[in-house]
Amino acid sequence: MAGTLYLCATPIGNLEDMTYRAVRVLQEVDLIAAEDTRNSIKLLNHFEIKTPMTSYHEYNKIEKGHKLVEKLLDGTDIALITDAGTPGISDPGEELVKMCHEAGVTVTAVPGAAACITALTISGQGTRRFAFEAFLPTDKKERQAVLEEMKNETRTIVMYEAPHRLVRTLELLADTLGDRGVSICRELTKK
């Protein structure tokens, strides 16, 4: 019988964001696939989780993804964790989930903190209808094309940006989208 891939949300700043269920699942699975094992070991040590860990990240997602699917098909239960938040949201976990669905492997969520939803709820912007854009492309033409698509968007737009690109991105948003409300959220749960 095939194993299950568990998408376990991890804290987005405060270790107390971790759910009891996520801790239990991480203790019970056979293997943890982590975006950055150096970062994840701190989380696992904090919760005294001894489960073996392997890396799964942007630069090995295809090759390692196939290996993980093979293990899952052989009956291994695997938890996927990201550095912060929910795997599959703006990270390589999306690719592994696709591979699992194609192979007929069960994928289940162990929900918890997600930066996009947390930011939306504290932003003061409309929450009834929203669009999530993740990170804008780094390629100038691709980025401008996405911004042009966003011009006619009437819903609240949630997006991520790296601190070193924030000012430039805000300038691009103002130039392209005009007069709109903006909320900047960071360090969402560290207190």
Region roles according to the model:
Residues 1-59:
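Glycine-rich, flexible N-terminal cofactor/catalytic loop recognition
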Residues 2-3, 114-191:
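Beta-strand/loop-alpha-helix module characteristic of Rossmann-like adenine-cofactor folds
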Residues 3-5, 74-79, 156:
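Loop/turn-to-beta-strand initiation segments
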Residues 12-15, 83-87, 163-165, 190:
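Short glycine-rich anion-binding loops that position phosphate/pyrophosphate groups of nucleotides
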Residues 26-32, 104-108, 156-157:
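Short active-site oxyanion
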Residues 54-63, 135-140:
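Conserved helicase motor
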Residues 58-73, 92:
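Short phosphate-binding loop-to-helix
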Residues 74-133:
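Short glycine-cluster motifs
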